[in-house]
Amino acid sequence: MEEQARPPSRPAASATLPGSAHPGGAASTATAAALSFSSVATVTLGNQSDAGRPEAAGSRGPAPLLWHGAAVAAQALVLLLIFLLSSLGNCAVMGVIVKHRQLRTVTNAFILSLSLSDLLTALLCLPAAFLDLFAPPGDSGPWRSFCAASRFFSSCFGIVSTFSVALISLDRYCAIVRPPRDKLGRRRALQLLAGAWLAALGFSLPWELLRAPREPPTPQSFHRCLYRTSPDPAQLGAAYSVGLVVACYLLPFLLMCFCRYHICKTVRLSDVRVRPMTTYARVLRFFSEVRTATTVLIMIVFVICCWGPYCFLVLLAATRQGQTTQAPSLLNVAAVWLTWANGAINPVIYAIRNPNISMFLGRNREEGYRTRNMDVFLPSQGLGFQARSRNRLRNGCANRLGACSRMPSSNPASGSGGEVVMWARKNPVVLFFREDPPDPVMAVYKQHKSETRDSSI
């Protein structure tokens, strides 16, 4: 009888690897440990080529399956938190700006664009990440178009978000550093916003449009399609990736830093130049500009921290020219998630730094809101209610400041000017002025102006 050919046996884990300098012994043990760690990392990332096969699932014990389930649950929890903060927070910001007419200003138009881009990112990009956690591994198949659309939306809205923060910094630069005549008007602001959205659309579309005339793409998993940090270098070239990062991220980052530097310089000089002040309205403006500059700095820091790793990985992939041959690593996934998290951080900054948003979210800061919007709020009320509001505000200032309330007033027309000044120093407000506030505060009660002041976030 002819003997049946036996299948080639699998080498043992301790066998000597080809090209190994020291066969057996400690080298074999280190190799086995490295292979074991690599398999655990593959299970943790999920959606790899052999993760869903029955024989692979049978070969794994209950411990790797438990670790895999815990990793998927943790990732789903993080994505859910980002989704809730981005969607609910940005909806709240947009609702406040649209609801209150006095907030429909130039600066808030840029913030509205930023919130809209973050909201669309949460609604159109995060569902693909949830699908990736539970989709079977292998070829993306019917989800290929959905993955391509998700990557397009993520790129487009990410560029819009970066441009919007740069425009906010530019608006603050023009309002604080430049003379009042150089401030951005409504028409110029709309032109800048339209240019930002069109530029984002133009930079994002070639990722998929330039791919059609080329050779058919190789099959890839949904996970690999979603977390690819740059276009295919073989089709679009490394120059496109570098140009995209420089034009859409690095240049806006430099503009933010430039504006922030000059804002800090101007505020520091103003702190020396404007003392003593003749009216406490100017003191309110000074401290509000200081807090405004701090808020802009916080936004810039988070934008750079969230988008910096992504830009670095795009440049790294462009230099290595090997993005298509490698599966997305943990760094790619973390970098993309950081860009999504930036949209969830911005509403938190607004809620902490702005009394309007915090009041909308249920925090009781009515006095600060009325103080910094006195020229908008009081003319719409009766004279008796105005007097009661002023008296209640004075009493609140005196109770909060104690000894500081005895500070002599810089405004001789009002005995409580020093109190309000000190209260403003303790509780500064976020106020962006488009026009100078009236010097005497009593002019608010005598004039009923039709146009409202700028009190943006």
UniProtKB/Swiss-Prot annotation:
Chief location of this protein within or outside the cell: membrane
Compartments it resides in: Cell membrane; Endosome membrane
Stretches in topological domain Extracellular: 1-64, 131-156, 211-235, 317-329
Name of the protein in question: G-protein coupled receptor 135
Database matches in InterPro entries: GPCR_Rhodpsn, GPCR_Rhodpsn_7TM
GO (cellular component) term, any one: plasma membrane
Region (Disordered): 1-27
Protein's gene: Gpr135
PANTHER family: G PROTEIN-COUPLED RECEPTOR, G-PROTEIN COUPLED RECEPTOR 135
Chain ranges on the Cytoplasmic side, renumbered to this chain: 86-109, 178-189, 257-295, 351-457
Bilayer-spanning residue ranges: 65-85, 110-130, 157-177, 190-210, 236-256, 296-316, 330-350
Subunit structure: Interacts with MTNR1B. Interacts with ARRB1 and ARRB2 in a spontaneous and agonist-independent manner; leading to the internalization of GPR135 in the endosomal compartment.
Molecular function via GO: arrestin family protein binding; G protein-coupled receptor activity
Keyword Nucleotidyltransferase set for record: no
Function comment: Orphan receptor. Has spontaneous activity for beta-arrestin recruitment. Shows a reciprocal regulatory interaction with the melatonin receptor MTNR1B most likely through receptor heteromerization.
GO BP terms: G protein-coupled receptor signaling pathway
Gene3D superfamilies linked: Rhodopsin 7-helix transmembrane proteins (1.20.1070.10)
Lineage: Eukaryota, Metazoa, Chordata, Craniata, Vertebrata
Coiled-coil stretches: none
Keywords: Cell membrane, Endosome, G-protein coupled receptor, Glycoprotein, Membrane, Receptor, Transducer, Transmembrane, Transmembrane helix
Topology relative to the membrane: Multi-pass membrane protein
Glycosylation sites recorded in the entry for this protein: N47
Superkingdom field: Eukaryota
Family of this protein: Belongs to the G-protein coupled receptor 1 family.
